[in-house]
């Protein structure tokens, strides 16, 4: 594995580079072009990736703890299982990325574009997730303050079937608490059939 800790790779062309398991801790990759690069299991702890192009890059299981990814272009990137604790991603484009099972504790995610992001089982304790843009570029901007509800809100806004289901549940849902005699239960069952 390559030891590039502290290396100055600013503006470097690393497209499709295979640097998996490499030590890039503290490295400067500001404005680097790393589209489709393979960073699996790499150590990028406290690395500077400000405004880096990382489209389709694979950071699966990588250590990005404390990394600076402000303004980074991560569209379609794979961050599954990555350690992003304390990372700064203000203004990053995470559209169509996969952050499933990533550790984002204490991560700053303000102003990120998250359209189409896969975010199942993400650890978000104390993460700052405000002004997340859930719409794709070219559509009116809609912002939410929670990654876990971003996709749901987008579907509510753009999918008539989902809206119809929610409306039906709200219109027909009735909560009845208590104990009922057999005669009253018959009446309740009749009401249920009508609804």
Describe the predicted segments one by one.
Residues 1-150:
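Tandem repeat scaffolds
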Residues 148-195:
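Conserved N-terminal substructure of TIR/SEFIR domains
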């Amino acid at each position: 594995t390559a030891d590039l800790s502290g290396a100055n790779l600013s503006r470097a062309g690393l497209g499709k580079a295979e640097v998996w398991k490499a030590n890039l801790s503290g490295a400067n990759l500001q404005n680097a072009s790393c589209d489709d690069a393979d960073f699996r299991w790499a150590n990028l702890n406290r690395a500077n990736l400000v405004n880096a192009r990382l489209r389709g890059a694979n950071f699966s299981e990588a250590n990005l703890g404390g990394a600076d990814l402000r303004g980074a272009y991560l569209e379609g990137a794979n961050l599954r299982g990555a350690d992003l604790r304390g990372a700064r991603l203000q203004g990053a484009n995470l559209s169509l990325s996969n952050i499933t099972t990533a550790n984002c504790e204490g991560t700053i995610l303000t102003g990120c574009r998250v359209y189409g992001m896969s975010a199942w089982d993400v650890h978000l304790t104390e993460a700052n997730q405000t002004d997340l843009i859930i719409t794709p570029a070219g559509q009116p901007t809609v912002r939410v303050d929670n990654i876990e509800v971003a996709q749901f809100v987008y579907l509510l806004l753009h999918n008539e079937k989902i809206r119809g289901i929610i409306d039906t549940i709200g219109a027909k849902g009735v909560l009845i608490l208590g104990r009922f005699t057999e005669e009253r239960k018959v009446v309740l069952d009749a009401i249920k059939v009508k609804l």
